[in-house]
Structure formats: C-alpha cells, structure tokens
Amino acid sequence: LLGTGESGKSTFIKQMRIIHGAGYSEEDKRGFTKLVYQNIFTAMQAMIRAMETLKILYKYEQNKANALLIREVDVEKVTTFEHRYVHAIKTLWDDPGIQECYDRRREYQLSDSAKYYLADVDRIATSGYLPTQQDVLRVRVPTTGIIEYPFDLENIIFRMVDVGGQRSERRKWIHCFENVTSIMFLVALSEYDHVLVE
C-alpha cells in the first residue's frame, strides 16, 4: 500500500483486519484508548494554533484560558482524560470561533477524525471507556517503517505491506518491491483541496 501521509493506508489495513481478519479484541481496543485521547488533544491544539494564524476570535472570553490550558499539554505524555481538560475541550468546541476555524480546516492541517471525536467527548470521557471499532478505525497514528499484515481470503494468503507515507519514510519504499505482484496507491478524497503538511 502506497500513498502520501494521511491518505488512509493504515485505515485500509484496519478495515481489512476487521472484515477479513480477527478484528480487534477488547484488549486490542484498550490499547487504543490513550491514542484516542491524544488525537483529541492534537486536534484541539491544531485548531487553537489555527485560530491565531487565521485571526479568528473566541466568542467566549473564558476560552482564552481554556486554549492556554490545552495548548500547554504535552500530547505525547497524555494517558488519561482528566475532567478539567474534558471541560476545557468541550467549552472550546462549543465556541463559534472554534467552529468557524473548523469550517476553514482546509487552510491548515487537521485530522479527518477531529469532529468525530470532539462531538463525542462525553462518551470518550466516561470512566472505563473502551474504544469502539469506529474509534479504532479513526485513530490517527503516523506509520513509521514498514509493517506487513497477512490476510487469509478464501484460502489465499494476501500479504499487505503498510509503509509510512511521510516524505522521510518514502525512501524506504524501494525495499518493499521484491516479489510484489500488486501495488495499491491510496489517495484521500477528502483532501483534494487541503494544504499538504510537508
């Protein structure tokens, strides 16, 4: 599977795993919890930065403080979803300024799953939260390196190779082409008018 970063290569593999493989056990899903939280913080931080760049104002004054609180979070260290952050993110998401910023998302880099997660923060913030299959499918984690996934379809073994799509990862692609019978190049239809992050 080839394509630029965020073109859907890993999502395609996840779909294949759900449809034709073993799917995701409860333990597998639990492993995505932290990543869902991180995706929420990453999305909100991207919008907070874009608010400044696009010169959009918050309608509600308290959201300046909420933005500062969320902006200072080190996303890599996020493992839980504390109430003060949940409240800040919900309040920010409800601000007309952030909604205008979201509507202009093609002008900056924002994950496709941002609205999906931000509109469902209450469910995700509950104690004992276990990601659904849809939550798992929408998690954005940049692929680094080369990962092979075998699938058995009607007694035929398919080996799909997922490679990182970021520019720095593309030089590794050539090593994948020995004994290859098919190549799928994926393109995200939702990004035809977006600015490429690189």
From Swiss-Prot:
Q: Where is this region: G2 motif?
A: 135-143
Instruction: Give the family from UniProt.
Output: Belongs to the G-alpha family. G(q) subfamily.
State what this protein does: Guanine nucleotide-binding proteins (G proteins) function as transducers downstream of G protein-coupled receptors (GPCRs) in numerous signaling cascades. The alpha chain contains the guanine nucleotide binding site and alternates between an active, GTP-bound state and an inactive, GDP-bound state. Signaling by an activated GPCR promotes GDP release and GTP binding. The alpha subunit has a low GTPase activity that converts bound GTP to GDP, thereby terminating the signal. Both GDP release and GTP hydrolysis are modulated by numerous regulatory proteins.
Q: How does it assemble?
A: G proteins are composed of 3 units; alpha, beta and gamma. The alpha chain contains the guanine nucleotide binding site. Interacts with RGS22. Interacts with NTSR1.
Can you tell me which residues bind GTP?
A: 3-10, 137-140
What Gene Ontology terms for biological process does this UniProt record contain? action potential; adenylate cyclase-modulating G protein-coupled receptor signaling pathway; phospholipase C-activating dopamine receptor signaling pathway
Q: Which InterPro entries match?
A: Gprotein_alpha_su, GproteinA_insert, P-loop_NTPase
Q: Per the record, what is one GO cellular component? A: cytoplasm
Q: What is its main location?
A: membrane
Q: Which residues take part in binding Mg(2+)?
A: 10, 143
- Full protein name: Guanine nucleotide-binding protein subunit alpha-11
Membrane topology classification: Lipid-anchor
Superkingdom of this protein's organism: Eukaryota
Q: Which UniProt keywords apply?
A: Cell membrane, Cytoplasm, GTP-binding, Hydrolase, Lipoprotein, Magnesium, Membrane, Metal-binding, Nucleotide-binding, Palmitate, Transducer
- The segment annotated G3 motif runs over 158-167
Listed GO MF terms: G protein-coupled receptor binding; G-protein beta/gamma-subunit complex binding; GTP binding; GTPase activity; metal ion binding
Q: Which parts of the sequence are annotated with region: G1 motif?
A: 1-11
Substrates-to-products reaction catalysed: GTP + H2O = GDP + phosphate + H(+)
Q: State its location(s).
A: Cell membrane; Cytoplasm
Q: Which Gene3D superfamilies match?
A: GI Alpha 1, domain 2-like, P-loop containing nucleotide triphosphate hydrolases
Start and end of every G-alpha domain? 1-198
From which source organism is this entry?
Canis lupus familiaris (Dog)
